[in-house]
């Protein structure tokens, strides 16, 4: 997966704004920050520089967040995660897409609360797969718990591209019937 350096991001941001077709842009998170570090860049300076043109244009920015692992590949203490949301919001990030590859709500719900405390929009994520146990009911019950915890948005994250259109459509209908004000995004 290609991830650009901060100098490339800063050059492309004004062009994205000029296109005039985006309400949201992913600006940082796990992979972005790891690439910054690999290039010897400061990810905190990078996110401030990259989000600035979007903030000025009124375009919301969002980051990817691995729940219990925050932006890393290993668990991060709760106090560090709580602080991370405050820092990211101060740096210009509006939305955090919180996911756990196992859909374990215990790994996602604390991050929803921390993001809300920091003034961010927590977009709780359902990682989609296809198997006999991964039914509409399975995913809808997880969505219910995440929404009850405060998530105003749900993302259906089909990382492997194996989500079945019929099942995904029914899942969206099921969530919207129970939670009509919740925004649902497919990724």
What do the PLM-derived regions correspond to, one by one?
Residues 2-16:
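Short catalytic helix/loop segments, enriched in acidic residues and glycine
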Residues 1-2, 22:
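Extreme N-terminal cap/leader segments of soluble proteins
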Residues 19-22, 93-95, 151, 181:
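A structural motif
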Residues 14, 23-144, 160-165:
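Active-site beta->alpha loop and helix N-cap motifs at the rims of alpha/beta catalytic domains
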Residues 143-158:
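Conserved C-terminal portion of the radical SAM core fold
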Residues 159-187:
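Catalytic alpha/beta core domains of metabolic enzymes, predominantly
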């Amino acid at each position: 997966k290609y991830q650009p350096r901060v100098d490339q991001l800063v050059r492309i941001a004004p062009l994205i704004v000029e296109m005039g077709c985006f309400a949201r842009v992913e600006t940082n998170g796990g992979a972005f920050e790891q690439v910054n570090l690999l290039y010897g860049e400061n990810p905190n300076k990078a996110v401030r520089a990259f989000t600035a043109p979007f903030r000025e244009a009124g375009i919301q920015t969002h980051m990817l967040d691995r729940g219990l692992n925050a932006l890393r590949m290993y668990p991060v203490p709760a106090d560090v995660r709580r602080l991370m949301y405050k820092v990211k919001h101060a740096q210009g990030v509006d939305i955090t897409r919180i996911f756990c590859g196992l859909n374990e709500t215990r790994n996602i719900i604390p991050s929803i609360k921390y993001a809300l405390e920091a003034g961010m929009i927590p977009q709780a994520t359902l990682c989609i797969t296809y198997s006999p146990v991964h039914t509409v009911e399975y995913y809808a019950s997880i969505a219910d718990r995440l929404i009850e915890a405060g998530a105003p948005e749900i993302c259906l994250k089909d990382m492997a591209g194996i989500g079945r259109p019929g099942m995904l459509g029914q899942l969206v209908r099921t969530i919207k019937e129970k939670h009509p004000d919740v925004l649902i995004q497919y990724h």
